[in-house]
From Swiss-Prot:
Compartments where found: Cytoplasm
Protein name: Beta-ketoacyl-[acyl-carrier-protein] synthase III
GO cellular component: cytoplasm
Stretches for region ACP-binding: 254-258
InterPro entries: ACP_syn_III_C, ACP_syn_III_N, FabH, Thiolase-like
Keyword Lipid metabolism: yes
EC number: 2.3.1.180
Organism: Bradyrhizobium diazoefficiens (strain JCM 10833 / BCRC 13528 / IAM 13628 / NBRC 14792 / USDA 110)
Family: Belongs to the thiolase-like superfamily. FabH family.
Top enzyme category: transferase
Length: 326
């Protein structure tokens, strides 16, 4: 029996021009390039310019994705934007993106699941498309985490960067086989609020009337990450009858190279199948997966028909996985 799948038509990304290296950070705070690389794998990150907002990054990534897909912005009837750093409390940054693209129809809204945001947004758009409510969607992850960092906290300020990535999805009829269908094959989302104090921002417009800064218990996050990530990936494999040998590329959330390496090892995924961009992007939260997809697509690694495994974990905790055939 045939199925409607959300097929990826194209992807795109945008990174701010300013690059901050580990050496530049070491000149400001008590850290070193060796310390950062050894613990995280990060060597540099991009930082948004003054006056450059999350919506600006998202619009540029969306435009690149539309160009890659070969479709007009007016054909988009759904925009789902994953971000933890919106331009304003309201309206949604997605409507600013919609307006910036010259679209005044359909629906646009933000989704917040921190670093898991893109996987959550992908799953949300996929469900809308498969029901027939919408035909063609932009799924965007965009962040300006530099605005919520405590630049005196060496445990967090060295980790994050700014950027945006996007994919264009279209509802298409497929044969109905997880083994061959193009598009989003399966998604699995999880949350557990018992861990909300382990990674959070210590402020909020409705509680403290402040923006606040990112706070993290790094060891606690690391301790939970690998187990949660692998469990939700196993869920994806069990739901489809696929396995680690089936996938062509593993595109994880780019938080920390040690977490990525440990997850791939536990799942028996060969290192050469892992797409890594954390060294040059840092942790861009909801933007990291679409940024990595765009890199691997542009350099020719990801090709039509490839099966891609996505995973992410973020504050909350939230975590999720997706299997997508390009």
């Amino acid at each position: 029996m045939t199925k409607i799948r959300s097929v990826v038509l194209g992807c795109g990304s945008y990174l701010p021009e300013q690059v901050v290296t580990n050496a530049q950070l070491a000149a400001r705070i008590d850290t070193s390039d060796e310390w950062i690389v050894q613990r995280t794998g990060i060597r540099e990150r991009h930082i948004a310019a003054e006056g450059e907002f999350t919506s600006h990054l998202a619009i540029k990534a969306a435009q690149a994705a539309l160009t890659d897909a070969g479709v007009d912005a007016q054909s988009i009837d759904l925009i789902v934007l994953a971000t933890s750093t919106p331009d304003n409390t309201f309206p949604a940054t997605a409507v600013a993106v919609q307006h910036g693209l010259g679209i005044n129809h359909g629906a646009a809204f933000d989704l917040q699941a921190v670093c898991s945001g893109f996987v959550f947004a992908l799953a949300t758009a996929d469900n809308f498309l498969r029901t027939g409510a919408f035909k063609r969607a932009l799924v965007i992850g965009a962040e300006t985490f530099s605005r919520i960092l405590d630049w005196n906290d060496r445990g967090t300020c060295v980790l994050f960067g700014d950027g945006a990535g996007a994919v264009v999805l279209e509802a298409q009829e497929q044969p109905g086989s997880a083994a061959t269908d193009r598009g989003v094959v399966t998604t699995h989302l999880r949350s557990d609020g018992r861990h909300k104090a382990k990674l959070f921002v210590d402020g909020g417009p409705s509680s403290t009337q402040t923006v606040g800064h990112l706070r993290m218990e790094g060891r606690e996050v690391f301790k939970h990450a690998v187990g949660m990530i692998t469990d939700v990936i196993v869920d994806a494999f069990e739901a489809t009858g696929l396995n680690a040998d089936s996938i062509d590329w593993f595109v994880p959330h780019q938080a920390n190279k040690r977490i990525i390496d440990a997850s791939a090892h536990k799942l028996h995924i060969a290192p050469e199948k892992v797409v890594l961009t954390v060294d040059r992007h840092g942790n861009t939260s909801a933007a990291s997966i679409p940024l990595a997809l765009a890199v691997a697509r542009k350099d020719g690694r990801i090709k039509r028909g490839d099966l891609i495994l996505l995973e992410a974990m973020g504050g909350g905790f939230t975590w999720g996985s997706a299997l997508v055939r390009w």
